[in-house]
Amino acid sequence: SLSADFAYSLTKISLEKLSIKTPKSALEGTAYLNYKRVDFKDFLNKVKFDVAIDKAHISANELNLFYNEFGAENVFYVATKIEGPLNNFKTKNLNLTDNFNSNIKGNIAFKNLFSTEDYEIAANFDELSSSYNQLIEILPKIIKKQLPSTIARLGEVSVIGDIKLSTTFLNVNCLAFTNLGEVQTSLELKNIQNIDQAS
């Protein structure tokens, strides 16, 4: 079910006091869609979203209906602000946890998630806590292809800093705390679409 104080004009849709409930998810916040009428022809790239998620729990199974990359049976607990069109949006002040005890706080930009072009994710983390095995549960198709399995040896990892990931490269500039110790790293991997041959 969806309820909101709804307003519509030729340039904006407003959904204030927004509440969305599905069988496995719930979300509270506000949403604005800003556009020119011609923008609907290229909805993914032109219609700009301005969304505040005050609190939500979102089923990965339900997200897979839109973006079939998430692991099954997970639930994300999230509060954030989202700005931009669906194919080039940013989360600001993201606070996200899940059933596998991963925790993300920071700002993340997503490009081309709904496109045939190479995707790119650029993140500035105040905190990213997870393990390789937890990440596989969250994004199994992406993580298994993009990150080498040797990272699993690090165990639980807490990261502060910048990470940029695309179809073909991984750039990391961060401070990481792991089960094996602490490391300040600046790393660039290319050719990660063939992760075992990455350099």
Predicted regions and their residues:
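Extracytoplasmic loops and strand-loop junctions of Gram-negative outer membrane beta-barrel proteins
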Residues: 61-64, 142-146
